[in-house]
From Swiss-Prot:
One Pfam family in the UniProt entry: FlgM
Keywords carried by this UniProt record: Bacterial flagellum biogenesis, Repressor, Transcription, Transcription regulation
Domain of life: Bacteria
Biological process terms in GO annotation: bacterial-type flagellum organization
Protein name (record): Negative regulator of flagellin synthesis
A Gene Ontology molecular function term of the record: sigma factor antagonist activity
SUPFAM superfamilies referenced in this protein's UniProt entry, alphabetically: Anti-sigma factor FlgM (SSF101498)
Gene3D superfamilies reported in the protein's UniProt record: Anti-sigma-28 factor FlgM
InterPro entries: Anti-sigma-28_factor_FlgM_sf (IPR035890), FlgM (IPR007412), FlgM_C (IPR031316)
Organism of derivation: Bacillus subtilis (strain 168)
Family that this chain belongs to: Belongs to the FlgM family.
Function: Allows the coupling of early and late flagellar synthesis through the repression of RNA polymerase sigma-D factor-dependent transcription.
Amino acid sequence: MKINQFGTQSVNPYQKNYDKQAVQKTVAQPQDKIEISSQAKEMQHASDAVTGSRQEKIAQLKAQIENGSYKVDANHIAKNMINFYKKQ
């Protein structure tokens, strides 16, 4: 009667393949990259300029409201609303 050698290699013969695949997966993962075009950068600068002027306008309106000098022109608002809905 012949008894074959019994070891851990024959218990899990797929372990070698699994280990190789794990190494390949960790090596093969690419890094993410972000590239911003010059046109997008120009748009960002333009947006920043508009935001700055808008902040100034908001500060002026807040000051007028606190002083009580802010007046609402109902006719102007109504005309703008009518023009807005006519365009749609």
